[in-house]
Amino acid sequence: MTLQIIAGRSGTGKTTHLMDEVGEKIKQNSKTYIFIVPDQMTFQMETSFLNKENLAGMLGTQIFSFSRLAWKILQETGGLSKTFLSQTGIEMVIRKAALDQKDKLKIFSRATSRKGFYSELANLFKEMKQEEVSIEDMVQSATNLSTSVNNKVHDISLIYQKYEELLADKFLENEDYLRLLAEKIADSDYLNRTEIVIDGFTSFSKQELTVIGELMRKCDKVTVSLTLNVPEIQHGLDEYSMFKASTEAYYALLELAKLNGTQVEENKFFLENKRAKTESLAFLANTWGHNKFMSFKNEPQNLKIHQANNRRAEIEGIAREIRQLVLNGYRYRDIAILTRNLGDYDVLCETVMEAYNIPTFIDKKRAMAKHPFIEFIRSSLDAILFNWKYEPIFQAVKTEFFFDITEKSSLNRRKADILENYVLENGIQNKWKWEKEGDWVYRKIRGLSTNVLPQTDEEIHMQSIINEMRSLIVNPLATLELNLRKAKTGMEFALALYHYLEQVNAVERLESWRQRAEEQGYLELAREHEQAWSSISALLDEFVEVLGEETLDLDSFTEIIGTGLDALEFSLLPPSLDQVVLSDMENAKLLDMKVIFAIGMNDGVMPLRQKDKGIFSDQDRDALRAEDSKLKPSAKNNIGEEDLLAYKIISLPSDKLFLSYPAADEEGKVLSESNYLRKIKGQFNELNESVYLTDPSLLSDAEQSSYIRSKQATLGLLTSQLQMYKRGYTLSSVWWDAYNSYFENEKESIMAKQVLSSLYYENKTKPLQETTAKNLFGETIHASVSRMEKFFSCEFQHYAQYGLKLEERGHFQLQAVDMGEIFHGAMEWISAELKRNNLDWGNLTEEECKQMAKLAMTFLAPKIQHEILLSSKRMEYIQYKLLQIITRATTVLNEQAKSSAFRPVGLEVDFGLKGDIPPLKIPLQSDSELLLQGRIDRIDMAEQDDRTFLRIIDYKSSSHDLALTEVYYGLALQMLTYLDIVVTNAQKMIGKTAEPAGVLYFHMHNQYVQAEKELSDEAIAKELQKSSKMKGLILSDPVAVSLMDTTLEKGKASTIIPAEIKQNGELSARSRTATRAEFDKMRQFVRHKYQEAGNKILDGAVSINPYKLKERTPCQFCSFRSFCGFDPSLTSNQYRHLANEKAETILTKMDMEGGTQ
């Protein structure tokens, strides 16, 4: 029984010596030789043995990690009768333990709901077992420490004891295997006549040292290889050395041998670097970690440092280097890319390497949390926990597990979208609404629905789809909830979930996905679908095994299962025989690499700026270790570990070492280079830093040609170079050659044309063909005024809404348009009620106004937006506020009616083919016509002598005025159109001709009076009346004005209309008036605008041409902005800037352009 230690720096040939020595021994005897290496190194070591000629494969040699050796020995000697718990199972049990003890916890009671907390606890428990720290020892160590540490240890103790109780000596963790291994080594026949070789470790846990001690007693020989600086073990331990841990391991092994009475053979020390093939790489590896500064005098060979503009430029530069290396004879498997921050690079690397046709293996396990199956389970449980809220329900729906597996996915998705739209629009946010008896009724009505018509065929069809999809969700989910609510034990909860997955045919769906992925060549995706089911099956088995008999409630079950789901990861396929490996530096599984790219070498990353992580802070660990705790040291006391990690990287390649860093992140934030790079540049005076550029145009032709490395990747660069050429920059012949090369091959030519077409891209539309326009809009265009205003705002907006029939998804929320409908509906109802009872607006009392408003709101509230005003306390309050506005409006109209001779003769008057008034007909080109239809809020009439006047009142929920500029540009046609229609059809409406008296906006709002001093009730009433003044444009005729405000006196301004009388009886310039002739001109011009719009629509006008008037544009509230892609920074996308001119100028233009009908 002997111990031998092999020591030396990396690359000095320790592993090669051990393999050669074993190879020679195998030829001479029949012993078994067992190599023990770290878990992540077993595959690489096996590959090395298979490739070693003198070992004749692996006959007589076995490769194990400590855990795999434990499994082998326990299989032989007994001890595997207990169930093994995975990391997922451990975290679930820890969560159960924490939940059970939650009320007793002093410091972690809130942390029990924090994501990652149970993973941190699992790591701490793992460390305690590895370092053989009992919970009693920890409690003892914390006795004299701060309250904070004491409380932490108190909570950890409670959770740990409960955790151990739940395991009940029936389950094994990974660390338990090593404890059992140490106990069973003496009983193993397999270990008779064996020699053990331990390689690849920089340190050993207490548990591992215990196992090594038992191996010393049992086996013929134990050889341990350690990477360290030989002078340090000859001259004593350096507290700050990067080899501190391995030097401590060296002394610990010698102490073990002494305790066991094991003979120590003469140590073998290796000093010469045999791996590095160039003097510069050998010098860097040999001098790293020395306290004494040493510099390299010559120009370094095969050692490069690169700066990059950003991470993408860095990876693209590396991809070009790799392509060149392969051209020079290297294999992809000779090359590795290592980084400290893999999360910043993995997706980027995958994309870039694919573009450069570089096969790449990314050595990173991915969480399963985003797989549709895992998301389905989590969302289903959340839906039940949160009373069937919209978000979790449709997160589950979108995974497709509710769908009929025999139907096409695309059809099911369309049906699910229809259901989702219905749920959103109807505010279905709880279980009661989902399970309400009877079919859900579909009506294509939004806003106020006072007149319910029979359902159309389309509505009936949509309703059948909605209820079909509803039942696909409700049936299984309601069954799951019923079974979960009845469950008491872990077993019952697990069975409820399992039966739910059976009910939705989860296995069959995952299998169909797997088969389809395989058929399409996506083998990794196929494996993921396969693993998803096997992982959930294993998770439920473990849950039942450990917690099957435990009493649980629904909250505890979902929390524990949620912890398990968070811990699930996809297992990795081993790399193929020829791939570049991208790996995290700390977990890299590499041997015999020729080329290393160390990327992301930034300050704070290498060396890592240490932060507290885990249950104990660095301060906590230092305090506990000061009290003789055997926990691992804090990060700040492991200063040398960062230097050692860097040393592993720089000593790994035999041929070439590339070090690089980005100068900025994706957001442009400046990033500094690593101190290690500054140190290397200080050592190598002749080392010149190069730059990976995003734009190579500043380089020489020869340097630019190095950027052309693959057809797909070069296309992107070529496009950017040609863009610059279009802007007047010189283009190297290198890029013209590249351009021409794409058109020598038909397949590449197609790809190039698709990509390069972006050079000529303009965000412009082409006019529709005449037949297409007529098919979309009809030869007779039936249109509303607002539609025509939309056309003049932006032709494409009109096309999207009325041609393509696009519309926003409806939401169960009260919008401005809904409030407008309530106000219109209230005024219509009150007016109709007054007419029915032969009452006049001006004769109402204040109390009657309030009562009318209240009755109107009572009638309307259930009829707006699927009863939204009755849906919650918040909506009840909004209803109250709306009632206040309606009451105030009723009172103001009552007051105005007392001072006006005008009375309503029409309310909510429809004009159109089926209206009270015929449509306004506008002749168009090619014998087509435009028929205008719509609804007029209110038509007022007044008479004096033989003159009859008509005016239009429009109720608005926001402040409006009539701007002639907007009329001229077609943006505000409504009021003058309505006036034209009623004056034109006066004979039909009132049995006589009439004059236009004006158009006025009545603003319905809650009014407030601002005053610097206290006002009387009379003064307040006067101020409120002023704020209720209607805006618009009225006839500049004293008779008409006096009829509108019978109280208006000379020298005063009206409180009802926009008019002011001077002392001489004339209207002042501050009045908003127009003559009869001007009104006629405007009416004629408005008709001309409709004719212009109608002809343009039939001509196929669909330009993306939004206007800009002052700071206002239609894009501000446009539903289709993301669809049209309007971008003012593009020369092809510019606003139509509209001039805001004086009324006189506008009227002159109208007169000139108005035309005749």
From Swiss-Prot:
PROSITE patterns according to UniProt: UVRD_HELICASE_ATP_BIND (PS51198), UVRD_HELICASE_CTER (PS51217)
Keywords per UniProt: 4Fe-4S, ATP-binding, DNA damage, DNA repair, DNA-binding, Exonuclease, Helicase, Hydrolase, Iron, Iron-sulfur, Metal-binding, Nuclease, Nucleotide-binding
Positions of the UvrD-like helicase ATP-binding domain: 1-278
This enzyme's EC code(s): 3.1.-.-
Keyword Magnesium belongs to the record: no
Pfam family of the protein (one): UvrD_C
Binding site for ATP: 8-15
Quaternary structure (record): Heterodimer of AddA and AddB.
Family: Belongs to the helicase family. AddB/RexB type 1 subfamily.
Name of this protein: ATP-dependent helicase/deoxyribonuclease subunit B
Origin organism lineage: Bacteria, Bacillati, Bacillota, Bacilli, Bacillales
